[in-house]
Amino acid sequence: MSNKLLYSGKAKDIFSTDDEQVILARYKDQATAFNGVKKEQIAGKGVLNNQISSFIFEKLNAAGVATHFIGKVSDTDQLNKKVEIIPLEVVLRNYTAGSFSKRFGVEEGIALETPIVEFYYKNDDLDDPFINDEHVKFLKIASDQEIAFLKEETRRINKLLSDWFRQIGLKLIDFKLEFGFDKDGKIILADEFSPDNCRLWDAEGHHMDKDVFRRGLGELTDVYQVVWEKLQAIK
């Protein structure tokens, strides 16, 4: 297999494969926060992220969610369908936390009657600004129909994920998804799902996600290992 580096991101390197419709994602031992302002190498993080994301994507595939995930091929590597990434971060919030609490001046941990879906424009130079549907259309990122699908699919994924995490005693506070167009022009779930891009709290309100790194609350890999071990009990 000939692997040429196509893209180096904060958490993963993306390589070509012998199949032009398939890419290899290699998870890094790097933790970043605040758009890369805080950065640290943490041994074992790449393995844990690959394990967790592969597990979740396998379950999503089995539940009928169309994703880019093909399979885990090593401790740090997985094969994915090549997609044209939509430059949006789709965030769903089940509880108030993080930037939402700061933006609206509310305390963290308030359950939202209806989960809220938000869009953020993927642009590092602009610090990934919060945008609405009209901005998405103005920037020609997605049509009305595509926007509606992104929201509907994110809500469907939320129901699945919330149920799975509830089974193992964790609250899914919020999460970020990315989507892309496959070779047939179909929108499918891409990127990853791990404690890097979601918030998980246990019954005592302890953070079981990257906030441990953001806020200096403990050892990141210890927390991710607990999440990985708990995931084995999901039915």
Swiss-Prot record:
Pathway: Purine metabolism; IMP biosynthesis via de novo pathway; 5-amino-1-(5-phospho-D-ribosyl)imidazole-4-carboxamide from 5-amino-1-(5-phospho-D-ribosyl)imidazole-4-carboxylate: step 1/2. SUPFAM superfamilies: SAICAR synthase-like (SSF56104). It is an enzyme of class 6 (ligase). Keywords: ATP-binding, Ligase, Nucleotide-binding, Purine biosynthesis. This is Phosphoribosylaminoimidazole-succinocarboxamide synthase. It comes from the Bacteria. It catalyses: 5-amino-1-(5-phospho-D-ribosyl)imidazole-4-carboxylate + L-aspartate + ATP = (2S)-2-[5-amino-1-(5-phospho-beta-D-ribosyl)imidazole-4-carboxamido]succinate + ADP + phosphate + 2 H(+). The keyword Ribonucleoprotein does not apply. It comes from Streptococcus sanguinis (strain SK36). Disulfide bonds: none annotated. InterPro entries: SAICAR_synt/ADE2_N, SAICAR_synt_PurC, SAICAR_synth, SAICAR_synthetase, SAICAR_synthetase_CS. HAMAP family: SAICAR_synth. GO terms for molecular function: ATP binding; phosphoribosylaminoimidazolesuccinocarboxamide synthase activity. Belongs to the SAICAR synthetase family. Its EC number is 6.3.2.6. One of its GO terms (biological process) is 'de novo' IMP biosynthetic process.
